[in-house]
């Protein structure tokens, strides 16, 4: 039973933020689509787990010190994770007829990002210290989870702009990945040499 309490502690911050974003939409999205987007966000771990070992092998051979931390922060973590989140929005959410205003992208962006973050949080809370840890759940509730939510806001808004502002659609689509990668990478890199980096990055 106590394992479920740790899992609840891991996913609750993400769920609360998704609900908060959902309630900010003046014309709410279908809950079923938002929920599926959250689940697809969780499922991005399948693609991410295929790519990460390849990048790990590459980085061990070519990078040391700060260059390793830079690669690890901006490419291995930020780019890979944000790319797969963007795929959920582009190939699932934007094809729904309910996706008809910029705020919709924000809601779906938060849902996809926090779907991934919730799954990642479960792994951190249950396994990172060798035993379940509420301390890690609390720490990440104020660090990694809000980061993923913010990246989702930016990504979702810019993907919306790429659809509804046709003159700059390719630029907005590029920025929808580039800016969240920069935010995510800077966050990870800023903690790269600290004692808590393995808990919150």
Language model region names:
Residues 1-201:
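Hydrophobic alpha-helical segments at protein termini of multi-pass membrane proteins
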């Amino acid at each position: 039973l106590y394992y479920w309490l740790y899992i609840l502690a891991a996913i609750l911050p993400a769920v609360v933020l998704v609900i908060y974003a959902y309630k900010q939409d003046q014309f709410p999205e279908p809950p079923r689509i938002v929920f599926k987007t959250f689940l697809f966000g969780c499922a991005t771990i399948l693609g991410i787990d295929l790519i990460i070992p390849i990048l790990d092998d590459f980085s061990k051979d070519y990078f040391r010190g700060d260059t390793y931390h830079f690669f690890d922060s901006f490419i291995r973590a930020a780019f890979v994770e944000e790319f797969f989140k963007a795929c959920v929005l582009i190939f699932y959410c934007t094809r729904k007829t309910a996706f008809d205003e910029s705020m919709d992208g924000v809601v779906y962006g938060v849902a996809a990002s926090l779907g991934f973050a919730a799954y990642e949080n479960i792994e951190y809370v249950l396994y990172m210290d060798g035993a379940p840890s509420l301390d890690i759940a609390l720490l990440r509730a104020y660090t990694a989870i809000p980061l993923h939510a913010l990246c989702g806001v930016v990504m979702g808004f810019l993907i919306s702009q790429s659809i509804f502002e046709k003159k700059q659609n390719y630029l907005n689509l590029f920025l929808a990945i580039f800016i969240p990668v920069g935010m995510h990478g800077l966050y990870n890199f800023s903690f790269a040499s600290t004692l808590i980096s393995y808990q919150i990055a």
